[in-house]
Structure formats: C-alpha cells, structure tokens
From Swiss-Prot:
Heme 1 (or BL or b562) is low-potential and absorbs at about 562 nm, and heme 2 (or BH or b566) is high-potential and absorbs at about 566 nm. The keyword Lipid biosynthesis does not apply. Its cofactor is heme b. The gene is MT-CYB. It is found in: Mitochondrion inner membrane. Component of the ubiquinol-cytochrome c reductase complex (complex III or cytochrome b-c1 complex) that is part of the mitochondrial respiratory chain. The b-c1 complex mediates electron transfer from ubiquinol to cytochrome c. Contributes to the generation of a proton gradient across the mitochondrial membrane that is then used for ATP synthesis. A ubiquinone binds at H201. Heme b b566 binds at H97, H196. PANTHER family: CYTOCHROME B. PROSITE patterns: CYTB_CTER, CYTB_NTER. Belongs to the cytochrome b family. Heme b b562 binds at H83, H182. This is Cytochrome b.
Amino acid sequence: MTIMRKTHPLMKMVNHAFIDLPTPSNISGWWNFGSLLGLCLIIQIASGLFLAMHYTPDTMTAFSSVTHICRDVNYGWLIRYMHANGASLFFICLYLHIGRGIYYGSYSYMETWNIGIILLFLTMATAFMGYVLPWGQMSFWGATVITNLLSAIPYIGTDLVEWIWGGFSVDKATLNRFFAFHFILPFIIAAMAMVHLLFLHETGSNNPLGIPSDCDKIPFHPYYTTKDFLGIILLLAFFFTLVLFFPDLLGDPDNYSPANPLNTPPHIKPEWYFLFAYAILRSIPNKLGGVIALVLSILILALLPHIQTAKQRSLMFRPISQFLFWLLVSDVLVLTWIGGQPVEPPFIIIGQIASLLYFTIILAFMPIAGLIENKMLKW
C-alpha cells in the first residue's frame, strides 16, 4: 500500500517541503528563524484581517476607529497590540535571520538570498504603510517625511511624490491607498516566501560548518519539526509577555495624539526597526546622497556573494572575520540608538562615524579579512 503523503499531488508538495526533506544533521537553533518568520506572517495576516473589519481608512475617522477597536470590540485591544508588536517581533526574527545568513555564508545561495532581499524590502514597505494607518501624529509626520524623500530624485521627484500622495499633501487619498497596499502586500510576501523556500530546497540548507552535508542528512520530520516547535513556544512566550505586560514599550507616545498637520512633533522618527537606516539617511547632509545611502544600506546585502574573498564559507573558524561581524552588529545597534536621538552634537558626528563604519566593514574590511585568513591557512 502506498503512503498517501507520497502520492497525493497536494500532500506530496507538503511532504517534500516539511516531512521527508533531507536536512543537515548539525543545523543549530539559528536555523529556526525561517519557520518563526512564517509564524509571524500568519499572526500578522490573521490579526490584520480582524482589524480591517473594524478600521476605516478615512482621515476623519481613522484615529477614532482604532480607539473604537481598543475600547468597544471584543478583545480588540488584544488584536491591535498583537498586530503592533507582531511587526516588531517580525523584524527581530528578520534581522536575526539575515545575521545568521551573513555569519554562516548562506548568501552563497544567490537565488534564495536575492529573494530574501526582495522580501526584506516588501516587509519594510508593508510596515511603513501600516504605521501610517492609525493616523496619529507620528503616522502623519512619518508618512510626510519618508514619502518626501522621493522628491530628491532628479527631474521626476516632485511629480512622483504628488502622485504617491494623490494630492499636494498626505491626506485622505494617501491613507486610503496605503491601507489598500498594506492589506495586499502580506499576501505577496507569503507568495514570495514560497519562492524563497522553493529556491532553498533546490540546493538544500546550509549548515554551521559551511561544508557539503549530502553524506549526513536526516529527515525534517520528526527531528526539526520538534525543534521548530520549541522555537515557536519560546517565541510565543516572549511575544505574549510583550503584548500583555508591555504593549507600548516599542511604540511612540506621539502616536496617541491624532494627526495634526499644523503641529509638528519635536522629533520625527520611524519605528525602532527602521532607526538604523534612518540614522544613515540623516548622517549625510545632502538630500539625494542621504536617500542613496538609505537604499544602499539594505541593497548592500546583494553585494555580499560578489565580494566574498575567503575560501571558507562560514565564519565559524575565521576569528578576524568573526570580530568584524560582531563589530558590524554593534555598529547597527549604535545606528539604531542614534536614529532615535535628536539631530544635535554629539549625536551627529557619532551617526556619521557609525554610518561610514557600516559601509567600510562590509565593502572593505570583510573582503580584506578573507584574503588575510586565506594567507594564514596557506590557501
């Protein structure tokens, strides 16, 4: 008798992806973040769907509709805070996932890596548009400042900004279209995640040693389903602690004031997960230069496979590159801190040094370290 999961057309796909998938026997907990990102996406789509049932994308009623959700809808406060903190959780997992990819050289799988970068851009776009929807002070001014950056594009900039706004300022048309895009993009992200998995399963997973593991593979189920389940339990414990005890920890108090175009907040800043890129943007005095640096701060990830000089894939046995990696992590944390500070000394110069260091580590120090390590190993 044939096993149904191996013959049924639909179940066969699930089987090849999650049950009988040959997986390296030595992948660590750092490989859990892919499945955790899938869980975050499910939480966001589910909670977002229920929020959309009660939300109205209109400048006059958007803020009060969010208040209505929190006060009058059954467990509306819970759904709202799950959605808001779910975004933070999504980005925590996302950055850890990318960090693991850099540390263990997973960027060698070019297709998977490039789809991942597209996923990062899509997620950032979705999160930005979602932040505009509650129509608080930081929603309005964040939308105004960030969309205005496009006006730095030569010749077409101003027209492009007005086209995105649907008028001459951020208004009802902007809010309406942002809601439409914010609703559809997570489904596009889900589809792209499938493509991400498809390309990954073409090559098989990387492993901490960064060496081929064809001789030592084990089935995904039950070994890694159990391991993923442990990750999911820990993630949910952290998530619900955040949602139920510290729901406003990562938010901005300014967003509890309704949007007012006549009153600018003292410090306009995006959510915490964009602060590192925002700090890079602010560290360049020129508007166009800042926008280019902002885009390159993410797009630079696409260069990693092309500027790798080391003969070893993983950083596991490369102490110089390891030091540079953790220096890069520290630098991103410094940039995140600077992004939330006002534009005044000494924060300006700290931000400029940290921004320069960010690009220098990736473009110069890491490739040079790879060559030095090759020499040390007489390769």
